[in-house]
Amino acid sequence: MDRHGVCAALMAGDNEAVAGAQRAHPGRIFGEYHASPTDIMRAVRELEHYVRDCGFVALRIEPFLWRKAPTDRAYYALYAKAAELDVAFQAQVGHTGPLFPSETGRPTYIDEVALDFPELRIVCGHIGWPWTEEMIAVAWKHKNVWIDTSAHVPRHYPPAFVHFLRTFGKDKVCFATDYPLLRWDRVLPEVDALELDPDVKRRFLHDNAARAFKLAS
């Protein structure tokens, strides 16, 4: 991180391993609670534990693993708890890399969740591709919705997304890599090649994520 000027990073995976990494690197690594679809009420209790006791900053759900769209009632207790705890909800949005049906990743489902939970900060991964313009519309509509760029290299961002990032969406896009899938030494030079205005670049690389996840770094 230091070598590439990265001041903070979000981490998800095995929850105990993430908690250990956050303890080892306070103020640099911020954990996300990765919810399992097998026991909802256990997940609700674990979310509270990892936020209150371990300092996690987000609930992370990958709907394709649950085989349920984000609007399914199975998630709503978790959304309510995340809103109560004032942590973000980070969702996999867009097609799935693994061989699962992609329908659960349609951005339009996030529209309904944002309406039902206006206090819940929602960060949508993978630029919503291939439904990126649909994702842009949802993020623009809702003040509590952001888009992140995980798993997408800047040179392949769709033109509509780059325009959104540069202009009316400059407060709505959070830089992400999906590390180690994409590494900073590959992606950050491509961010430089976008030649963003300094103010836009600062928001993209830092300010928007700091606001969406309420990071102190």
Predicted regions and their residues:
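Short, well-ordered alpha-helical microsegments
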Residues: 15-19, 40-43, 110, 131-135, ...
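Short active-site oxyanion
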Residues: 5-9, 30, 121-122, 173
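Conserved, mostly hydrophobic/aromatic
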Residues: 1, 18, 50, 82, ...
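Mid-to-C-terminal alpha-helical segments outside catalytic/metal-binding sites
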Residues: 1-4, 162, 169-174, 181-217
